[in-house]
């Protein structure tokens, strides 16, 4: 299980707290380290096993980063684990490796004077860097993608975060042409759409989220 806190829809803040208990007592999220904050789909909440922690102390501070990574337009095919004999082909967003570093305040609310975000795309507020270098590891590791988190990929990602005790994102690593450890293989299979019904049912019963 992982502890998460719903923020302004559709965002959720995940914390670096993993437990085998479905409902740990007296969780104070103010004292926890943030794993990552991201936008999620209703599908993720519907299929994940979610438990409400009624006695938890929420952190209502607006501490989440307003810097994000936005993928390029278009799409492309990538091959993970090349030369391993067990390669996995995936279609991902972005017509070339990398992405844009952008500013996007997740707490922003439309007003009559400003009904959409400032950037012409309407997706974010402004561009900070139009092409993040593929070697800019500090930037790549620090900031989240602007896309939506879905089931079951996000659940597998959270499991990997528990293994590495930090935020990791196999999909983002694919975007930036990074080599992937073997532990990421199931996540990459999910991205590729190559998992079967048996895998899906196992995932449905295995991954749980506490909010």
Describe each model-derived feature in a short phrase:
Residues 1, 13-23, 46, 53-62:
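Structured alpha/beta reader/binder surfaces that contact nucleic acids or chromatin modification marks
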Residues 2-10:
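Short beta-strand-centered aromatic/proline hotspots
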Residues 13-41:
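Short solvent-exposed strand/turn elements
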Residues 36-107:
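Long, low-complexity intrinsically disordered regions
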Residues 82-211:
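A eukaryote-biased signal for long
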